[in-house]
Each structure stands twice: as C-alpha cells, then as structure tokens.
Swiss-Prot record:
Domain of life: Bacteria
InterPro entries associated with the record: Acyl_CoA_acyltransferase (IPR016181), Aminoglycoside_N6-AcTrfrase (IPR024170), Bact_Acetyltransf (IPR050832), GNAT_dom (IPR000182)
EC number, as in UniProt: 2.3.1.82
Protein known as: Aminoglycoside N(6')-acetyltransferase type 1
Length: 145
C-alpha cells in the first residue's frame, strides 16, 4: 500500500470513495470539488492505493482564519477521511493522516485540526485513535435577516 497526493489520474478513484463517505453530495459537485483541489495550492487530497485499487482518501485544506481549539495560524484542517470497510484497522487512516500532516508542515502549519458532529461517536473514536484531542464543542445558530 502507498499514499499518493491526488492528481488527475486519481480523480475517478477519489470520487468513488468520496461518494461512499458523502452519498448525498451530487456527482457533479464531487467532480467540481476534485477539480478545485487539483488547482488550489491551499487544498490537497491523498489517496491510499493497494494493488492498483483506491482504498482510502483524506481531504485537507490550509486555513488562515480562526480554527476552533487552535493557537496558531495557518492550520492544516482535515476536511474528510474515509477507508473502505475491508481495509479498516490496518493503519491506512494513520498513514493518510501522516501524509496530510507532512503536507501541512511543509505549508508552515504547526497544528492540525478537524471536526465532527456531536452525535458521530464513531468519527470521534477514529479522531482520538489518530492522535487528535477534543478541544471544544460548539453549537452553531443562525437568524435570517
């Protein structure tokens, strides 16, 4: 297995994995996101490949705005991570996170952050297993003008 930063040849593999993580996201939106990731310097995606098959991915961004729970800027932000169920518990996510962290460090980041919803306890356990620490819980509100 190896981890590669996504390029145009990985786009279809990435889209297939991403659809499993976010099935409600339309196909054309996944493709538009992929094109943006390939062109933007502050975005990256990493693909885990095993025997020519994409088995996982991690999307990341460099954020310069305030990131909850962080003390520095910029921060590398894990936007999403997914590993095929048959490849979980084998260190794939750990290697994806290491690739994201190296990328962020090369971009001047000293911290990595991520988020998940309070009810997504599986994601919380995965984050903790990957070395993240919970910093705060936030509820967002809105009011229409």
């Amino acid at each position: 297995m190896d981890i590669r930063q996504m390029n145009k040849t990985h786009l279809e593999h990435w889209r297939g994995l991403r659809k499993q993580l976010w099935p409600g996201h339309p196909d054309d939106a996944h493709l538009a996101d992929g094109e943006e990731i390939l062109q933007a310097d502050h975005l990256a995606s990493f693909i885990a490949m095993a025997d020519g098959v994409a088995i996982g991915f991690a999307d990341a961004s460099i954020r310069h705005d305030y990131v909850n729970g962080c003390d520095s800027s910029p921060v590398v932000f894990l936007e999403g991570i997914f590993v095929l169920p048959s490849f979980r518990q084998r260190g794939v996510a750990k290697q994806l996170i290491a690739a994201v962290q190296r990328w962020g460090t090369n971009k001047g980041c000293r911290e990595m952050a991520s988020d998940t919803s309070p009810e997504n306890t599986i994601s919380q356990k995965v984050h903790q297993a990957l070395g993240f620490e919970e910093t705060e819980r936030v509820i967002f509100y809105r009011k229409r003008c």
